Amino acid sequence: MQNPPENQGKLVRSIGLTSAVVLVISSVIGTGVFKKIAPMSYELQSPSLVLFAWLAAGLISLAGTLSNAEVASMLADSGGDFVYYRKIYNRFFAFLFGWTNFAVIRTASIASIAYVFAQSINSLIPIPNSSQELSDISIFGLHFFDNLGIKLIAIALIVFLTYFNNKGMKLGEKLSTTLVSLMVMAMLLIITLGLLSSSGSLEHLQQNSVRYNPESMSGSTLFKALALACLSAFWGYEGWNSVGYIGGEIKNPQRNLPLALTIGTLIIMALYLMMNFVYLYILPIDEFINIYEAKNGIGAVAVVKHFLGPWGGTLISCLILVTTFNCTSSTILLASRLFYAMAKDNMFFKKVDYIHPVY
């Protein structure tokens, strides 16, 4: 490994427990809690099973969190899972993990969350679309120019947040703290207003879909439906391990890193269960099945519009904007430490291991 240049900075352990918890929440809460109620309702056709799937996925994620936290406390360094793979297995598996994240996993996550951000803007302020002739152009079966306006907004967001987070961890941390505070307050407001709304009914939570057949929804069929629903829920929990990527910047990581992972995951579980309870309290499950089959709506938006009217739709759209903006920012910020660790270990482009002496 080459010696760093003289003007090379170094990573500083400046992230405390509270900030680490905020970053866990930031990197997890994105689109899943708003969009996945519809496909999960379609698969399970029962409110109680939908809530059970969210709980089961949360408990499995928590088990993963606790296992990861044990390793993170022993190997707290920049790079997170990459460092764990390298130490526990070997460089080859670490190499595969890192490049898979660069080529597919982190890249796709950032792109998909940014795209939902752009879609949310489009629902508030219509974005001009490309012409039909341009939209119909197909390259290897892919319509790159379809919804071009939305895609350009998503690209612009990624470029802006990459530049913004390039200015240092403290700036990204402050942004996440502000946005998480707004996000949690808005979610608690929706939960409170939903529970107090006269539009809701406990009967909605007790009534299965008109399509529900208790005889067929049992055994292997039930297991398959639960597995498919849990896949949707796991998308909502994805990203809890990302804070391990900044293990080299967390104060007292042997204590704070496991605590941040555990506390953050428990907070997310509680918010997800309460939000989905309100969804199913306000609307019967068949409404969510219809939303899924129509392919033209978001379950959370339909719920809030139902009990708060048009301004409720604006509120939930703004909340989705905040969460997707924040999740995109945190994913870009935290993933950069993975590629830094790879470059430092001569498994990635060498210039990526440069640390600005100021930022």
Model-inferred region functions:
Residues 39-42, 54, 61-158, 163, ...:
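Hydrophobic transmembrane alpha-helices that form the core helical bundles
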Residues 83-84, 90, 122-132, 211-216, ...:
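TM-loop-TM module centered on a large, flexible mid-protein loop between adjacent transmembrane helices
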Residues 38-40, 70-72, 82-88, 163, ...:
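Helix-loop junctions at the membrane interface of multi-pass solute transporters
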Residues 1-38, 42-51, 55, 61-66, ...:
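Membrane-interface "cap" regions at the ends of multi-pass membrane proteins
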Residues 15, 19-32, 153-160, 214-270, ...:
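Hydrophobic, membrane-embedded alpha-helices of multi-pass small-molecule transporters
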Residues 7-11, 167-177, 238-271, 343-354, ...:
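Hydrophobic, small-residue-rich membrane helices and short re-entrant helix-turn-helix hairpins
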